[in-house]
Amino acid sequence: MSNGIWQDWSVNRQDLRMKFILGSFRFAQKLHRWPKAVRWLAAPYLFVYQLLVWWELGIELNHKAKVGPRLRLHHGYGLVVHEAAVIGADCTLRHGTTIGNRRESADCPVIGDRVDIGCNSVIIGRIKIGDDAKIGAGSVVLHDVPAGCTVAGNPARPVGA
């Protein structure tokens, strides 16, 4: 766990708030992996995590989500990541972004490595975002995005050459 925290901190050097949020998130993830028989011992911390990070700071970074190392958060406020979402390594998330389900609870995106997601983007449903993709600000992504592709708009469509 500590290795994951240091990796996250290394790419969020300038922002103490994001370091606090990511450190709290990684610790909550670690506690959630405890065996079910003793997981109740983690309940007070998980409650405080939700109280401070979710309710007070407005960042719903669910500790059940699978998030790779070196996650970059720019501002982060208004961020929502569903518990069934998968986010790869070296991804960047900006404020106002929603990554979640469309219908069923488990119908959540799988986001590859090195994906850059612009502010106020919505990525919902059982879709895949390929490695090195870019999601433009304000985009609504409802379909798969190939690796290396840049998409923007509502609904999101490929842009550029």
Residue ranges and their predicted role:
Residues 1-57:
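Terminal amphipathic alpha-helical/low-complexity segments used for targeting or macromolecular assembly
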Residues 36, 58-62, 150:
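Secondary-structure boundary/capping residues
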Residues 55-59, 100-101:
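Short, composition-biased local secondary-structure segments
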Residues 63, 68-69, 74-77, 82-83, ...:
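Left-handed beta-helix
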